[in-house]
Amino acid sequence: MREICRSFQHLPGHPPSNAQWKIPLFLRDRRTLEPTVHWLVENSTAIIDMGNDIVLDRDGRSFVRVRYDSELYHDIIARLHSDANCIPVAARTRLMDDSFTLAEIGNLSYAHALNISVYLRKETAYPPVKMLHAHLDFLVSRLTAHPQFSKFQVRL
C-alpha cells in the first residue's frame, strides 16, 4: 500500500495559486492487470495498492510530475538494474523526465535523478536515452558559466 499526496511547487516569477483540481492516478487492477483510474480529489491523500507495479502511470498518460520517496526511488533503481523491462518504456521515459525536471526546480536531489539514469547502459529503447540527453544538455548549458566548468567537462 502506498500513500499518494499532492504537493505544489511554485516557480519564481509566477504568482502563487491555491487552485486545486482532481488528479487521475493511472494504475492497473491487481488481479486483472487492466488499466484503472483512481482520482485524487482536492485536499486529500489516497492509499492505493499498486500490486507488483512500482511506478504510477505505466503508460505515461498523466499531466503531473511524480515524485517518489527515497525508499521507492531506491527500489525503482534496483529493479531497473536487474531488469529494465519490468517498467514499460513510457514509464521509464517519464521517470527520467520527472526526476530531472524535479531536480532542476530544486524539488528532488540530482543524486536521485543521476542514479536513476545509470541503468541506461542496459537500455535498449531510444526514448529514455533521448530524454536523458535533453536534460543533460540543459544541465550543461546552465553549468557553462561556472568557473569550475572545465573540470566537469573533462568528465563528459
Predicted regions and their residues:
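Non-catalytic accessory/interaction domains
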Residues: M1-L156
